[in-house]
């Protein structure tokens, strides 16, 4: 039991260190995402995004169709020992699928745990089936990429998603992930990425906050691991990012609006998917740190109980031997 306690305590400290790095990556990407959003909002407010004659959007990612074929990106972890982190995500995925029963749903599974769960329930599409959705099926797996996530990988992945949307194979794209705010402020989110209904406004289809008990457990785990409970102090950076490209002036763009849309909208989609994966990774480490802290506390309690039981048994044995010695001496 003491060996188990040492293992869980070490895993808690490792998760705390990884949480700090994951949190830094998630926070450092927010100003860029905010600035990109502001540029697009400024461009949309000054350019015609729909053809005045046909009413068609000037970019395919702005097109909206009846939602018959859905792509959902389910972001879980590659490893377990994170409490209910993975279970909560796959349960939310099951609820999302049930709410959209009757529609064709393709699943991109990011993370081994979610992939394993979904594989047991739904078939994996063959290469010739990927181009056409059918009921619920797994069309992609992304295993071992979240721990060392690179934007280049997400960009390539988002290009394949955009290509399917542009061809009309899918009508909407959702990302299901854990949104990280701080160690004790997270929520499970189903976010609509495509179609882009309004630049800069996240369309949350479903959200679940941590319970009070979960927040208290995470707060205790963070304190013992030396991790800050609040959000990192990025107020000045966030303020500058929020003010970027928002001045009420007429910007002069070198490229025509159509070319800017062609360059920026795909990047906007890639950034949204990348951000969701970074947030989920930070949330995963926070959940694992909490789970290992709880396991360490349980091990401490078990060690105390076993030590007490062992001492009582030893004391009873010694007492019995003394009584036997005294009784033998008295009989002589």
What role is predicted for each listed range?
Residues 1-332:
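C-terminal beta-strand-loop-alpha-helix "lid" module of Rossmann-like NAD(P)-dependent dehydrogenases
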């Amino acid at each position: 039991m003491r060996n188990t306690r040492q293992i869980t305590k070490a895993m808690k400290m490792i998760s705390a260190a990884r949480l700090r790095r994951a949190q830094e990556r998630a926070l450092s990407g927010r100003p860029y995402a905010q600035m990109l959003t502001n540029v697009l909002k400024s461009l949309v407010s000054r350019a015609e995004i729909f053809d005045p004659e046909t009413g068609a959007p000037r970019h395919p990612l702005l097109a909206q169709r009846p939602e018959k074929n859905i792509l959902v990106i389910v972001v879980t972890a590659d490893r377990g020992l994170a409490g209910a982190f993975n279970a909560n995500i796959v349960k939310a995925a099951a609820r999302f699928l049930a709410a959209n029963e009757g529609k064709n749903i393709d699943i991109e599974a990011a993370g081994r745990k979610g992939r394993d769960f979904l594989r047991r329930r739904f078939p994996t599409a063959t290469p010739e089936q990927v181009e056409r959705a059918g009921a619920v099926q797994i069309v992609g797996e992304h295993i071992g990429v979240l721990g060392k996530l690179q934007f280049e990988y997400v960009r390539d992945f988002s290009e394949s998603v955009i290509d399917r949307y542009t061809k009309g194979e899918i009508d909407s794209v959702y990302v299901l992930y854990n949104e990280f705010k701080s160690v004790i402020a997270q929520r499970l989110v189903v976010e609509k990425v495509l179609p882009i209904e309004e630049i800069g406004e996240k369309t949350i289809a479903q959200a679940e906050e941590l319970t009070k008990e979960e927040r208290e457990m995470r707060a205790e785990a963070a304190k013992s691991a030396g991790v800050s409970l609040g959000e990192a102090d990025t107020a000045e950076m966030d303020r500058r990012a929020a003010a970027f490209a928002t001045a009420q002036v007429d910007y002069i763009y070198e490229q025509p609006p159509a070319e800017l849309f062609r360059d920026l909208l795909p990047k906007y989609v890639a950034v949204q998917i990348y951000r969701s994966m970074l947030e989920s990774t930070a949330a995963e480490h926070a959940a694992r740190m909490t789970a290992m802290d709880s396991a360490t506390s349980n091990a401490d309690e078990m060690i105390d109980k076993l030590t007490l039981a062992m001492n009582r048994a030893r004391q009873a044995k010694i007492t019995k031997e003394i009584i036997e010695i005294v009784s033998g001496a008295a009989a002589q």
